[in-house]
Amino acid sequence: MAIYHLHVKVIGRKAGSSAVASAAYRSASRMRDQRIDRVQDFSNKRGVVHSEVMLPDGAPEHLSDRERLWNDVEASEVRKDAQLAREVEFSIPREMTQAQGIELARDFAQAEFVDQGMIADLNVHWDIGEDGMPKLHAHVMLTMRSVDENGFGPKVRDWNRTEMVERWRERWAEHVNERLAELDIDARIDHRSLEAQGIGLEPQTKIGAPAQRMEVAGIEADRAEDHRRIARENGERIIADPSTALDAITQQQSTFTRRDMAMLAH
């Protein structure tokens, strides 16, 4: 059952983040952060199945080197609270093979980011979810300044507009659905909220690994409890009116299994 997920965030110094460390982690590589003279080594991290820096037309070739790229980004920002990069993270349908997922992620990054003038640092991760199934997703770190043969220029304010995020959300759904149709895969995703789709279920929160570790350690994790509450309440809604689940799942695929129904409720 294909699941829609696309999240956009800014990586900045105000939150104590480093563009170099962020890029090293997402690419499972070892990089030196020249600004603070520290090596960021995440080379033991597993699950990175594809990694590349994609340059727009006119960008100097040396910026295809990830370490050089993000050190140059750090050097171009002087403010203590500087915004360094934008990250777009999205889930790739499990119905696709690894190669198909990588191709889809590359095509999306090229059309929506690189062709618009951004440098895209793309990393595709293949993890195993809690249910033991493959969990294919991508992280794209994006530059925030214009770039030409001389290097970085001013920041492009249009890329910060809320409308851009809404466009990327919609365009990701379109890219995915077009590719699923081309591959003759019976699944679809929808970027709209459940309410906008006319589905009477509450959106499910996402529990990340930190929240799971906190619970194991006996520390209260509000997001984990909220996740379980929503799952219970959605399950109650489905029991009271099974057509709610039928409406939701048939918008994504024409056939489904008991497991698909369980995933919807959970």
Region locations from a protein language model:
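N-terminal nicking endonuclease/strand-transfer module with a His-rich metal-binding environment
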Residues: 1-266
